[in-house]
């Protein structure tokens, strides 16, 4: 199971240029609901390894990416495929 830590610097390479669809988990270390969601994200990463890339983005450390997705509450999940937004879910 591989979960990639993505930030403002590597977002384009890890997400937009990914050949696989990417599930992005926008989170923050202080966010309790994010901590509760973490085991589910880990499970998805394990079950779909090789079919889906899972990326975690700390909104406090990557404000440019968070702002570009208009993240106003977390956790927020986003799916990107071939550089395009496919879907998103809050909470």
Where do the language-model regions lie?
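Conserved Rossmann-like nucleotide-binding pocket used by diverse enzymes
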Residues: 2, 7, 27, 53-55
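A short beta-strand-turn-helix
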Residues: 3-22, 63
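Short pre-active-site segment immediately N-terminal to redox-active cysteine/selenocysteine motifs
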Residues: 19, 27-30, 73
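Hydrophobic beta-strand anchors of alpha/beta hydrolase catalytic cores
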Residues: 23-24, 54, 77
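The canonical Cys-X-X-Cys-His
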Residues: 31-34, 77
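Typically the conserved alpha-helix immediately C-terminal to a functionally engaged Cys/Sec
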Residues: 33-49
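Structural microenvironment flanking redox-active thiols in thiol-disulfide oxidoreductases
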Residues: 57-66
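Non-catalytic, surface beta->alpha helical segment in thiol-disulfide oxidoreductase systems
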Residues: 72-91
């Amino acid at each position: 199971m591989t979960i990639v830590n993505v930030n403002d610097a590597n977002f384009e390479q890890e997400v937009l240029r990914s050949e696989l669809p990417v599930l992005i988990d926008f989170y923050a270390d202080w966010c309790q609901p994010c901590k509760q969601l973490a085991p589910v994200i880990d499970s998805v990463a394990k079950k779909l390894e090789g079919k889906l890339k899972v990326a975690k983005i700390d909104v406090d450390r990557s404000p440019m990416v968070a702002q570009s997705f208009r993240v106003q509450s977390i956790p927020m999940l986003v799916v990107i495929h071939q550089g395009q937004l496919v879907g998103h879910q809050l909470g």
